[in-house]
From Swiss-Prot:
Organism name: Homo sapiens (Human)
UniProt-annotated stretches for the region Disordered: 1140-1175, 1215-1250
Coarse class of the protein's main subcellular location: membrane
Taxonomy of the source species: Eukaryota, Metazoa, Chordata, Craniata, Vertebrata
SUPFAM superfamilies: Fibronectin type III (SSF49265), Immunoglobulin (SSF48726)
InterPro entries tied to this protein: FN3_dom, FN3_sf, Ig-like_dom, Ig-like_dom_sf, Ig-like_fold, Ig_I-set, Ig_sub, Ig_sub2
Protein name: Immunoglobulin superfamily DCC subclass member 4
UniProt keyword Membrane, yes or no: yes
Domain annotation Ig-like C2-type: ranges: 29-137, 143-229, 242-330, 335-421
Stored Pfam families: fn3, I-set, Ig_3
Signal peptide feature range: 1-24
Length: 1250
């Protein structure tokens, strides 16, 4: 079974089966499979005798998976199974043509109605339902010949032509036989597909009987035989000197693209004419068109560009005689989907837009299916742009499923499908409850509701939606309502109309379900117009008043009564009477003859009477000469249309006395309409614009045409006889108003809205407001808002909202993300362009995710290094990172140690940990709104201490002795220095806080008196000299190298720069007093981390010990001491600064002088002080060059900027970007990694040392 491809509108399916018998048993008919999908169609399936087919519902590819259930329909109705048509277990449909009881090829008559028809299937899946294309199943047939070949006589070298015609399914193959033998294939014998046989250059051997043979899968038929006689050339008088005659002219032909077509042209003349082809439009004939035989055109693969009028021209040689024949070729193109709709995923209450474009000839019509059923437009679902655009607003769960665009024309159909997934987030509020609508008047309704039961505290606003509850293509209107409002008065409604209201709640996460709709019927209003009257008098003392009921568009409710007012002429006395609302006429009795009365009517509803009609004047007949004057026609009624009035009536009393009717009408002027003072005569004695129109007595209806819409007209009808005209029946009323044009005719679409302004409402919502276009001639009915994340080019993520107002609250957005908005105006059946783009970012929020790619690595027995990248969803500018760690992960979180660092830091070192201990770490990030979640726990085990890290007993004893001696020397030096320089200018004091330029400096310090001579602890970490202080030349020359108390960054190779200190004089002066209060210049800003733990009190002792040991090694004297500071500071300071930019301030870091590894054999004896001082200095310089940056001992955190700790560069980041971890210990730009600084979380207090 073959199915039609995209180039064919209909695929012919020819099934050829054989009846096989074995051992006397009849085998089942052979089965052929046909695949039904959402594609080009319809498919044509033709079943021959004893043939079967299996129809598969192959919609799995479009449905993204096999269907869970398949249902079939035939001719639009549910399929009923029977012996020759039943469902297979896999959902396929099996059908076959029954066997003829007599074994003939004839179809069983009962099977025709049972098997033949249009079949389609529905595939039910988890996401929805898909409908297949249609398969047209027919039984193979072959009718009798409708045209048999005819005998003919042809001269030698002439052209013979036989033709036969027969109908069949599938189209029969035509062959020809001569003497009941199939004709051989010769260039002279041309068999055309339409059943024509042309014999060129006829010879005597061609004479004989010919017949046509038609064959298809149903049977084979033979035509009647036709005899061909061959005459000698010139023997036929009819052909001698014959003018040009076209024997077989081309015929108008319509084919489907891809089929073949032959345009035949056979001409006769003496001598044989020349035949040529041209196109009537002057275009050249396509090069793929070939000549079949000598005079026929063959288009093997017809395409739309082949369409046109082809002209066959036959010219008689050596003369100017010619004959022409023309025929039109029309090539149809089956529909092809040029732009298929795309699958969409939308949150609840948002807008989805499907776009479908199709081509074909003729232009295909588009229609939409939802879950296999025809889509019915309503207030939320609209089909725009000639069916090519489907817009669904206020999406709900009921809108999820598959949407199919079906393009159809006379050549076939095409289909494309797309799914709509409705995303419902967790934590959304439930639907508002107890929605009520109370009518306040004919045009106002009070809608009230209660807040949702779930997550009510998260609501940021509501939207109220309403539309007419009856009718099709109703427009849905909506209003945005504040969070604190639970009722709204809706105005400008239509009276006596049913409306449907529902409410949706919004939180920062999105929209709730729609509430249960509330139905309300607006109250009646007074009618907006009065019925149109007709007056007539059946006798001199009565006036019959008749009217037509008001249409619903004018009644504004149910008309329950009419009031008729009347009086004499211009007299002030007016009489009135009321009748029920179901009455349409009233007889006014006891009137005076031959008097002018004025009459008017008003209609009333439960709300009261509307405006009355214009006064209508009527003269009653006279009491004299009544035997000859006809009365007025009865029951005059006029149906007002926009440009015409249909006048109908009944004959007056005694109709035999009348000869006919005269009809007059005129347009009432504006001044007369306002005054209403024209008094008609009794028998048509006034001038009228048109008339009289004489009508026969049998006529009872006449239409007045070419009137102006919305104008007031007066109609008069009188009956006449051979004596005179009778009394008039008069009607006065207005023609219907022309429908208000959408706007005056304009060439362009409506302009986009003006003054579009976006304002951030929360982290997930933005208010968008605009105003109507400043200059437009188009009536704006609603607007479409298009928005997407800034810079996005993925069309599937662009969202559309429809708003009837001039503002809309757009929710469900991502925090701290820039969006771009554009607004489009819509007229009636006309869409304008989108306006300029407006950008706005949502407000920040807490981070949704913790810092990513947290890595821990132990550096020393007491130090662990952390490295991380920013959160993948920071939802704002990260102002600081939070580090929690503990050796017991079961402790409550508030008992863990909290460390913080600024938002532009991505690595840190934690010091003061215990060796060979398992620590648990987790990190969080914080924006200005608050902290986000912490990462999952990660653990690390610190390194184990080596034996060489501790000193032996002899070393400790030597150190203690050295410390005591050094303290004494230090005290003596300090005293001597103070005596010599009592008024020395002091250096700037050490600041107890980080300088603004160096946020990485954190200190715990207090001002105090100079250290006493017995001090055994140095509690300050000193700075280098200020930039404006210059040491004496001797100091520059005698500067020695020492282990530094300041540290810098560490490169990836963990190499360290040399640590150097300008050492104080070794003579009696103490360097401690001179440097204790000196403030070090800051080399550059360094990010800071704070700690809650204080370093042990032994820090100063360790530093002093290091200095004394080094002094013992160096052993060279000092000539001068550096300037002493007047104010001395006692402090414990942790400094982490980068001095790499200054050659005068080497990169320093707090370190112990004790090497981790045992001293090499060539190392000088530090305890005894024996050894060459130069050798000791060189050795120490080498050793200090390889030390770690972080010193064991004090429990502290050293924060390393990424530039120093790893090759991880973080440029200035913008919202919408994040950092992605890449190999090489670096993070590259991926999503927001904003640099910010203003820590706001509580930190552990920093205590000053006592």
């Amino acid at each position: 079974m073959a199915r039609g491809d995209a180039g064919r509108g209909r695929g012919l399916l020819a099934l050829t089966f054989c009846l096989l018998a074995a051992r006397g048993e009849l085998l089942l008919p052979q089965e052929t499979t046909v695949e039904l999908s959402c594609g080009v169609g319809p498919l044509q399936v033709i079943l021959g005798p004893e043939q079967a087919a299996v129809l598969n519902c192959s919609l799995g590819a479009a449905a993204a998976g096999p269907p869970t259930r398949v249902t079939w329909s035939k001719d639009g109705d549910t399929l009923l199974e029977h012996d020759h048509l039943h469902l297979l277990p896999n959902g396929s449909l099996w059908l076959s043509q029954p066997l003829a009881p007599n074994g003939s090829d004839e179809s069983v008559p009962e099977a025709v109605g049972v098997i033949e028809g249009n079949y389609s299937c529905l595939a039910h899946g988890p996401l929805g339902v898909l409908a297949s294309q249609t398969a047209v199943v027919k039984l193979a047939t072959l009718a009798d010949f409708s045209l048999h070949p005819e005998s003919q006589t042809v001269e030698e070298n002439g052209t013979a032509r036989f033709e036969c015609h027969i109908e069949g399914l599938p189209a029969p193959i035509i062959t020809w036989e001569k003497d009941q033998v199939t004709l051989p294939e010769e260039p002279r014998l041309i068999v055309l597909p339409n059943g024509v046989l042309q014999i060129l250059d006829v010879q005597e051997s061609d004479a004989g009987p010919y017949r046509c043979v038609a064959t298809n899968s149903a049977r084979q038929h033979f035509s009647q035989e036709a005899l061909l006689s061959v005459a000698h050339r010139g023997s036929l008088a009819s052909t001698r000197g014959q003018d040009v005659v076209i024997v077989a002219a081309p015929e108008n032909t319509t084919v489907v693209s891809g089929q073949s077509v032959v345009m035949e042209c056979v001409a006769s003349a003496d001598p044989t004419p020349f035949v040529s082809w041209v196109r009537q439009d002057g275009k050249p004939i396509s090069t793929d068109v070939i000549v079949l035989g000598r005079t026929n055109l063959l288009i093997a693969n017809a395409q739309p560009w082949h369409s046109g009028v082809y002209v066959c021209r036959a010219n008689k040689p050596r003369t100017r005689d010619f004959a022409t024949a023309a025929a039109e070729l029309r090539v149809l193109a089956a529909p092809a989907i040029t732009q298929a709709p795309e699958a969409l995923s939308r949150t609840r209450a948002s807008t989805a837009r499907f776009v479908c474009r199709a081509s074909g000839e003729p232009r295909p019509a588009l229609r939409w299916l939802h879950n296999g059923a025809p889509l019915r437009p309503n207030g939320r679902v609209k089909v725009q742009g000639g069916g090519g655009s489907l817009v669904i607003t206020q999406i709900g769960l009921q809108d999820a499923g598959y949407y199919q665009c079906v393009a159809e024309n006379s050549a076939g159909m095409a289909c494309a499908a797309a799914s709509l997934a409705v995303v419902v987030r967790e934590g959304l509020p439930s639907a508002p409850t107890r929605v009520t609508a109370t009518p306040l008047s004919s045009s106002a309704v009070l809608v009230a509701w209660e807040r949702p039961e779930m997550h009510s505290e998260q609501i940021i606003g509501f939207s109220l939606h309403y539309q007419k509850a009856r009718g099709m293509d109703n427009v849905e209107y909506q209003f945005a309502v504040n969070n604190d409002t639970t009722e709204l008065q809706v105005r400008d409604l239509e009276p006596n109309t049913d409306y449907e209201f529902y409410v949706v709640a919004y939180s920062q996460l999105g929209a709730s379900r729609t509430s249960t709709p509330a139905l309300v019927h607006t109250l009646d209003d007074v009618p907006s117009a009065a019925p149109q009257l007709s007056l007539s008098s059946p006798n001199p003392s009565d006036i019959r008043v008749a009217w037509l009921p008001l249409p619903p568009s004018l009644s504004n409710g149910q008309v329950v009564k009419y009031k008729i007012e009347y009086g004499l002429g211009k007299e002030d006395q007016i009489f009135s009477t009321e009748v029920r609302g179901n009455e349409t006429q009233l007889m006014l009795n006891s009137l005076q003859p031959n008097k002018v009365y004025r009459v008017r009517i008003s209609a009333g509803t439960a709300a009261g009477f509307g405006a009355p009609s214009q006064w209508m004047h009527h003269r009653t007949p006279s009491m004299h000469n009544q035997s000859h004057v006809p009365f007025a026609p009865a029951e005059l009624k006029v149906q007002a249309k926009m440009e015409s009035l249909v006048v109908s009536w009944q004959p007056p009393p005694h109709p035999t006395q009348i000869s006919g009717y005269k009809l007059y009408w005129r347009e009432v002027g504006a001044e007369e309409e306002a005054n209403g003072d024209r008094l008609p005569g009794g028998r048509g004695d006034q001038a009228w614009d048109v008339g009289p129109v004489r009508l026969k007595k049998k006529v009872k209806q006449y239409e007045l045409t070419q009137l102006v819409p919305g104008r007031l007209y007066e109609v008069k009808l009188v009956a006449f006889n051979k004596h005179e005209d009778g009394y008039a029946a008069v009607w006065k009323g207005k023609t219907e108003k022309a429908p208000a044009p959408d706007m005056p005719i304009q060439r362009g679409p409506p302009l986009p809205p003006a003054h579009v302004h976006a304002e951030s409402n929360s982290s997930t919502s933005i208010w968008l407001r605009w105003k109507k276009p400043d200059f437009t001639t188009v009536k704006i009915v609603n607007y479409t808002v298009r928005f997407s994340p800034w810079g996005l080019r993925n069309a599937s993520l662009v969202t559309y909202y429809t708003s009837s107002g001039e503002d809309i609250l757009i929710g469900g957005l991502k925090p701290f993300t820039k969006y771009e908005f554009a607004v489009q105006s819509h007229g009636v059946d006309m869409d304008g362009p989108f306006g300029s783009v407006v950008e706005r970012s949502t407000l920040p929020d807490r981070p949704s995710t913790p810092p990513s790619d947290l890595r821990l690595s132990p550096l020393t027995p007491s130090t662990v290094r952390l490295h991380w990248c920013p959160p993948t969803e920071p939802n704002g500018e990260i102002v600081e990172y939070l580090i929690l760690y503990s050796s017991n992960h079961t402790q409550p979180e508030h008992q863990w140690t909290l460390l913080t660092t600024q938002g532009n830091i991505f690595s840190a070192e934690v010091h003061g940990l215990e060796s060979d201990t398992r620590y648990f770490f987790k990190m969080g990030a914080r924006t200005e709104v608050g902290p986000g979640p912490f990462s999952r726990l990660q653990d690390v085990i610190t390194l184990q201490e080596k034996l060489s890290d501790s000193l032996d007993m002899h070393s400790v004893t030597g150190i203690i002795v050295g410390v005591c001696l050094g303290l004494l020397c230090l005290l003596a030096c300090m005293c001597a220095g103070l005596r010599r320089s009592p008024h020395r200018e002091s250096l700037p004091g050490l600041s107890s806080t980080a300088t603004p330029g160096n946020p990485a400096l954190y200190s715990r310090a207090r001002l105090g008196p100079p250290s006493p001579p017995a001090a055994h602890e140095l509690e300050s970490l000193v700075h280098p000299h200020p930039q404006d202080w210059s040491p004496p030349p001797s100091d520059v020359e005698d500067r020695a190298e020492v282990h530094s108390l300041m540290g810098g960054g560490v490169s990836e190779g963990r190499s360290h720069s040399k640590r150097k200190i300008s050492w104080a004089q070794p003579s009696g002066l103490s360097w401690a007093g001179s440097w204790a209060g000196c403030e070090l210049p800051q080399a550059g800003p360094r990010p800071a981390l704070t700690r809650a733990l204080l370093p042990p009190a032994g820090t100063g002792q360790t530093l002093l010990l290091q200095a004394l040991v080094y002094d013992a090694i160096k052993g060279n004297g000092r000539k001068k001491s550096p300037p002493a500071c007047r104010n001395q500071v006692e402090a414990e300071v942790i400094v982490h600064s980068d001095f790499s930019a200054s050659n005068g301030n080497p990169d320093l870091h707090l370190q112990d002088l004790e090497p981790e590894d045992p001293l090499p054999p060539e190392a000088p004896d530090l305890i005894s002080g024996v050894g060459d001082p130069g050798q000791g200095a060189a050795w120490l310089d080498r050793e200090l060059g390889g030390c770690e940056l972080a010193a064991p001992g004090p429990d502290r955190l050293t924060c390393l900027p990424e530039a120093a700790s790893a090759s991880c560069s973080y440029p200035d980041l913008q919202p919408g970007e994040v950092l992605e971890e890449t190999p090489g210990d670096s993070c590259q730009l991926k999503s927001p990694c904003p640099l910010g600084a203003s820590p706001g979380l509580p930190r552990s207090p920093v205590s000053s040392s006592a």
